[in-house]
A protein has these predicted regions:
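Helix-to-loop junction immediately C-terminal to a conserved catalytic motif
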Residues: 54
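Conserved ABC ATPase signature
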Residues: 156-160, 164
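A short, proline-enriched helix->beta-strand linker immediately N-terminal to the Walker B motif
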Residues: 175-179
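Catalytic Walker B motif of ABC-type/P-loop ATPase nucleotide-binding domains
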Residues: 181-184
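Helix N-cap at the start of a conserved alpha-helix in ABC-type nucleotide-binding domains
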Residues: 192-194
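ABC ATPase "signature
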Residues: 240-241
Length: 267
C-alpha cells in the first residue's frame, strides 16, 4: 500500500508585520501531484502565506519542509541565509496576479531568462554555452506550445492579451521545473472572457499531476480542480478538507457565511 508522503509540510507558520499578525499558526501538507485551493476573503493572509512559501517573506515562526528537507525553521536562523534562499526558492514556482513579465523581452525570452541566468552560474557554462542555450530555448518553446502560444513566441508583452501574458508567466514558472507551482489569484487581473483560457491551462496541469497551490476567488474552479481546499479567515486556517465536503457541508459558521456570498451556481 502507498504510504502518505507529503511533498510539502507547513508546520505552525506565523508571520507579523509590525504589530499586525497576518498568519497565525498555519499548518497543512500537500502530496505530490495534488492540488490545494486556498480560499477566503481579502486580507485573510492567503498571499502572505504564498510569499512565505516562496521565500519572499520570512516567517516569524514555524517549519517549512519540502521532500522531507527542512527548508526553513524559525528556531534556526541558519536556514535563512541569503545565499541559500535563492536556491530554496527553486522548489517553488510562483505565478503572480499581474504577470510581472519583463516588457523589454519577448514571450520566449521571458520564459528562458531565469534558466539562462542559472546556467551561467554553472562551472561548465562557457565551454557548453551553445548547447545549453539551445536546450533552454527548446524547452521554452515546448512550454509555450503547451500553453497554446505557438504563434506568439516572438511577441512582446504589450502585444499580448492579459490571458496570453498570464500563460507566458505560467510557462516561465514551469521552466525551472519547480516541485510545487503556486498561483496567487491567477485570474483576478483578467477580463472575465479571458479567465477561461487561463483556468483551462491550470486544469490541464492538474490533469498532468502537477503539484499546485492555488489562491483563488473562483469558487467553482477551486472546488473543481482541487483535491483539498483550505479556508483561511483572519490569518487562521479555519477549516480544510475535501472540496465537496467543505463546499456542501461546511462545519464552521464563518465558512458558511463566506460561501453563502457565492450563489450555488457559481460552484
Amino acid at each position: 500500500e502507498e504510504t502518505y508522503m507529503p511533498i510539502l509540510e507547513v508546520e505552525h507558520i506565523s508571520k507579523s508585520f509590525g504589530k499586525t499578525e497576518v498568519l497565525k499558526d498555519i499548518s497543512f501538507s500537500l502530496e505530490k501531484g495534488q492540488v490545494v485551493s486556498i480560499i477566503g476573503s481579502s486580507g485573510s493572509g492567503k498571499t502572505t502565506l504564498l510569499r512565505c512559501l516562496n521565500f519572499l517573506e520570512r516567517p516569524n515562526t514555524g517549519i517549512i519542509r519540502v521532500n522531507d528537507d527542512i527548508l526553513f525553521d524559525g528556531n534556526n536562523p541558519a536556514t535563512w541565509q541569503e545565499s541559500q534562499v535563492r536556491k530554496k526558492r527553486l522548489h517553488f514556482g510562483l505565478v503572480f496576479q499581474n504577470f510581472n513579465l519583463f516588457p523589454q523581452y519577448t514571450a520566449l525570452q521571458n520564459v528562458m531568462l531565469a534558466k539562462e541566468l542559472l546556467a551561467k552560474e554553472q562551472s561548465d557554462y562557457k565551454e557548453h554555452k551553445k548547447e545549453i542555450h539551445s536546450q533552454i530555448q527548446k524547452q521554452a518553446e515546448g512550454l509555450l506550445i503547451q500553453m497554446g502560444l505557438k504563434d506568439r513566441m516572438g511577441n512582446y508583452p504589450h502585444q499580448l492579451s492579459g490571458g496570453q501574458c498570464q500563460r507566458v508567466a505560467i510557462a516561465r514558472a514551469l521552466a525551472l521545473q519547480p516541485d510545487i507551482l503556486c498561483f496567487d489569484e491567477p485570474t483576478s487581473a483578467l477580463d472575465p472572457e479571458l479567465t477561461g483560457e487561463v483556468l483551462k491551462v491550470i486544469r490541464e496541469l492538474a490533469d498532468n499531476k502537477t503539484t499546485m497551490i492555488i489562491v483563488t476567488h473562483e469558487m467553482a474552479f477551486a472546488r473543481d480542480v482541487a483535491n483539498h481546499v483550505v479556508f483561511m479567515d483572519d490569518g487562521h486556517i479555519l477549516e480544510q478538507g475535501d472540496p465537496i465536503e467543505l463546499f456542501e457541508h461546511p462545519k464552521e459558521e464563518r465558512t458558511k457565511q463566506f460561501l453563502s456570498r457565492f450563489s450555488q451556481d457559481e460552484y
